[in-house]
Regions:
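Short, well-ordered alpha-helical segments
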Residues: 1-20, 140, 198-217
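Solvent-exposed, acidic/flexible segments
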Residues: 52, 92-96, 134, 138, ...
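A short, hydrophobic beta-strand-centered structural micro-motif
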Residues: 28-40, 81-82, 133-166
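N-terminal segment of the mature soluble domain
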Residues: 3-17, 76, 81-139, 146-148, ...
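Signal peptide-directed extracytoplasmic domains
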Residues: 9-82, 92-98
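Short beta-strands and strand-coil junctions in structured, solvent-facing domains, enriched
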Residues: 59-61, 88-89, 162-164, 216-224
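Amphipathic beta-strand/beta-sheet edge segments enriched in Tyr/Trp
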Residues: 1, 48, 55-58, 145-204
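C-terminal/domain-edge helix-coil "capping" segments
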Residues: 63-73, 101, 105-114, 147-148, ...
Length: 231
């Protein structure tokens, strides 16, 4: 399981299926050490987290031998500002903001891109509004980026759209980076409502998928290609 998580962290999703399944005996030589963290004991059960460290050169050699590209560079933290369009208004700090709530429910990732969410406190309300975030107000975005100590800000604007004629509903998510190596990069994603799907359900699904795609985009931009190296 630990090795699978390592592969998922480093290798683009499109190439993960090309790797052979490894027996435990093949994985063990790649492990440098492991330790138990966060131990919890009770009279009926024991809970603990295992932290594995792998030997970089052997993992690299395994991936290289199988012709798989991968990324190792960790991104500077990214502050995500989730703006939700509702009845003509743009919501960011308003309560409720279902898009912000959906992002808070996304499980923490051990990937290469640390995503941070705003606290939504008075300092946030003072420093930037939903309209300023969507408009890309450079001065205000720089203020919140510095306060949170991040390398870039990702504004993700979500809105429910209805197709003319068919009345089919979809959640459209437009993202744009400000600052960092991805500055100015934009993307638009559409998530169709399934039958009887609620708005709360689709924003949750969209948040998880966008989080995955943020990781995938970073890996694709930072791939190590061994044909260009001597290592």
């Amino acid at each position: 399981l630990a090795f699978k998580r390592l592969v998922a962290r480093l290798v683009p999703e499109r190439q993960q299926g090309t790797l052979p399944a490894l027996a435990q005996s093949a994985i063990v030589p790649m492990v440098v050490s492991f330790e138990i963290e966060s131990e919890k004991r009770s009279s009926v059960r024991y809970l603990g987290s295992l932290k594995f460290r792998f030997q970089r050169s052997r993992v690299r050699q395994f991936l290289k031998t199988n012709g798989v590209e991968f990324a190792e560079t960790r991104s500077k933290p990214v502050l995500l500002l989730p703006v939700y369009d509702s009845a003509g208004a743009k919501l960011l700090w308003d309560d409720p903001n279902p898009w912000l709530l959906a992002w808070r429910a996304v499980p923490p990732s051990d990937g290469l891109v640390p995503i941070r969410l705003p606290a939504g406190d008075l300092a946030d309300i003072r420093d930037i509004s939903a309209e300023q975030a969507v408009a890309g107000n450079a001065a205000q975005l720089a203020i919140v980026a510095e306060r949170y100590g991040v390398g870039s800000v990702l504004v993700a604007e979500a809105s429910v759209t209805v197709a003319a004629g068919t009345w089919a509903r979809a959640l459209t998510v437009a993202t744009r980076y400000f600052g960092g190596t991805s500055d100015g990069r934009t993307a638009v994603r559409s998530f169709a409502f399934s039958q009887d799907e609620t708005a709360a359900s689709i924003v949750g699904r969209a948040a998880q998928q966008v989080a995955v795609e943020v990781e995938e985009d970073w890996k694709e931009e930072n791939l190590i290609r061994f044909e260009n190296q001597n290592s």
